[in-house]
């Protein structure tokens, strides 16, 4: 798997030179802190029960700029038991507590608004984790449903008699869909692949004179490696590559520095010519992350950047994180 991770980093130059178009799914800068929103296989992957709240304001100060709010939860169904150490036929053997569990569950609620169009949805996830010595291979499947809404009263129509804009106008539509993901992790590195909008459903919204709005499959590749630099410091380069079936790629290259797993900071470069600053702090089981995106284009003159806040609460002691790996 380390060879696959190296190959993943070799894809970066090619991905960086490809074109970029608008995508239908929201953008996240704190994707490492809440990877479950990107890959359903990460539901319960670390053994914690996690609750996350994320708020993102794109292009602050720009009228009708995109806004995203989400609340998510995922957990591992753990089974506590005991294992025998020594000869089970003798009386001097020992019973040592052990923790097992292969099933992860998760759910989220999201509201994503962009100008006069809003999307609100729910998702439910089932994940299955397979132990491979001190590594783990995970699969996840999500079923989701969304409501799309157009705020017609805020639209500006061109001509009063335009049949496209002033005919039968569906302001609300509903769409079911599904996501699938694979995730592999070790103590010091991780890599994942996921597909969103598997069903590519059509959304009957807007004027009947226009073709149906179709959701496109989105493909995500996530990877990272943690380098230990002494007792307290850690360095983690990471990448997030995403595209649609029409080949509209976008990539994030991130470098984060950790101090004793209590503080972290880093920088990301996104292929839409954005620089992202990330900072975070952990207080016991509470994780707080903030990111600031600054465009390197003319767009920067018309807004005050993009801001994202992520708050995560993880239940369970620190040792629980890898206790399920040593299952024998």
Task: Identify the function of each model-found stretch.
Residues 7-17:
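Bacterial N-terminal signal peptides
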């Amino acid at each position: 798997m380390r060879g696959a991770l190296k190959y993943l980093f070799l894809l970066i130059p090619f991905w960086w030179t490809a074109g970029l178009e608008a995508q239908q799914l929201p953008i996240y800068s704190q994707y490492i802190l809440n990877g479950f929103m990107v890959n359903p296989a990460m539901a319960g992957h670390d053994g914690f029960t996690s609750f996350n709240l994320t708020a993102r304001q794109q292009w602050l100060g720009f009228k009708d700029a995109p806004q995203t709010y989400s609340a998510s939860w995922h957990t591992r169904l753990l089974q506590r038991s005991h294992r025998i150490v020594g000869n089970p036929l003798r009386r001097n053997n020992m019973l040592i507590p052990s923790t097992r569990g292969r099933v992860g569950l998760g759910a989220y609620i999201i509201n994503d608004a962009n100008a006069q169009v809003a999307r609100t949805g729910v998702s439910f996830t089932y994940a299955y984790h397979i132990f491979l010595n001190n590594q783990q291979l995970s699969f996840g499947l999500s079923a989701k449903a969304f409501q799309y809404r157009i705020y017609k009263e805020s639209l500006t129509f061109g001509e009063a008699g335009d049949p496209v804009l002033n005919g039968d106008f569906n302001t609300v539509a509903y769409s079911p869909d599904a996501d699938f993901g694979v995730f592999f992790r070790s103590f010091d590195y991780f890599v994942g692949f996921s597909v969103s909008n598997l069903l590519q459903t059509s959304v009957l919204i807007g004027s009947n004179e226009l073709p149906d709005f179709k959701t496109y499959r989105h493909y995500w590749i996530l990877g990272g490696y943690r380098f230990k630099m002494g007792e307290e410091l850690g360095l983690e380069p990471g990448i997030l590559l995403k595209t649609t079936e029409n080949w509209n790629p976008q990539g994030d290259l991130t470098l984060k520095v950790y101090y004793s797993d209590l503080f972290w900071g880093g920088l990301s470069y996104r292929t839409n010519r954005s620089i992202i600053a990330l900072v975070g702090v952990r207080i016991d089981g509470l994780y707080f992350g903030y990111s600031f995106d600054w465009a390197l284009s003319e767009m920067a003159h018309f807004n005050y950047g993009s801001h994202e806040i992520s708050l995560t609460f993880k239940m369970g002691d620190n040792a629980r994180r890898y206790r399920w790996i040593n299952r024998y």
